[in-house]
Amino acid sequence: MRVYAAITLVLVANTAYIGVEAWGGLFNRFSPEMLSNLGYGGHGSYMNRPGLLQEGYDGIYGEGAEPTEEPCYERKCMYNDHCCPGSICMNFNGVTGTCVSDFGMTQGELCRRDSDCETGLMCAEMSGHEECAMSSECDISRGLCCQLQRRHRQAPRKVCSYFKDPLVCIGPVATDQIKSVIQYTSGEKRITGQGNRLFKRMPFA
């Protein structure tokens, strides 16, 4: 009789243990799968996925965010095989030459000097509302920096735009290099120069 009671007790305890494990699995409040997009747990964090604001993040902020040198630009060569695809080896004097672009850069491509561009194009800083990746690509002397622009029913994009606060810019911005003040049209001057004239007209003010 004691043997049956002991076996029954072991079976009840075993089923109770399995039941508790199952209930805990159903009603566990924290699950890393539910919060994987916030970086909790090992099921994929926000750093593994390129999000909207994390594009091009190199792990550095502020200083040292200058663009890295391209390994193919002006590389020393002897044959075209030593250059990257889209480049050819030009021997100007002697045996060794330098790798240059096969075709000139078109509008919107990054260049370093005027000779990199196609005929009729000049290499210049980006003007306003052109797409960018970092503020160093925009013309800071005109007061432009790279900003994330969101518009209704459009995908967000990074463009060179005028700024007042350097905190809205992507990447470091040297505000002391701004040479020109933003020029407003006459209508904008009139609207912004009024100040609080509306409140002065009110009879109760």
Curated annotation (Swiss-Prot):
Residue ranges annotated as propeptide in the record: 16-188, 202-205
Subcellular location: Secreted
Any GO CC annotation of this UniProt entry: extracellular region
BP GO annotations: neuropeptide signaling pathway
Extent of the signal sequence: 1-15
UniProt tissue specificity: Expressed throughout the nervous system (at protein level).
Keyword NADP: no
Location, primary (coarse class): secreted
Keyword Signal attributed: yes
UniProt entry keywords in alphabetical sequence: Cleavage on pair of basic residues, Neuropeptide, Secreted, Signal
Protein name from the UniProt record: ITG-like peptide
Species assigned in the record: Camponotus floridanus
